[in-house]
């Protein structure tokens, strides 16, 4: 009997957006043909915002598309933070 271990990738990043430091939690979804992360972050009221990031053609796409403006306006910063963190995993 052979045991196979599959690493669960999960990390948090503090990213400064619009003058506020926000904690983004990332969890890599296994069993996916496309590299995908489930992401959650709190807004100003403490409500959790959930979305997915999928790697398509060397760029990260965000789903759903109806995200708050402060996420929409800072997608480039979030993408870069993820790209900087991934080599550590």
Task: Walk through the language-model features, giving the residues of each.
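Acidic, low-complexity intrinsically disordered segments
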Residues: 47-89
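Extended aliphatic helical segments
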Residues: 9, 34, 39-41, 77, ...
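Negatively charged, low-complexity tracts enriched in Asp/Glu with abundant Ser/Thr
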Residues: 1-32
């Amino acid at each position: 009997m052979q045991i196979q271990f599959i690493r669960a990738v999960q990390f948090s990043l503090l990213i400064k957006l619009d003058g506020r430091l926000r904690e983004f939690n990332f969890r890599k979804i296994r069993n996916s043909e496309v590299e995908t992360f489930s992401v959650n972050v709190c807004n100003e009221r403490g409500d959790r915002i959930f979305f997915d990031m999928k790697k398509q053609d060397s760029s990260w796409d965000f789903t759903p598309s109806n995200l708050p403006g402060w996420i929409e306006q800072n997608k480039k910063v979030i993408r870069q933070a993820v790209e900087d963190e991934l080599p550590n995993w």
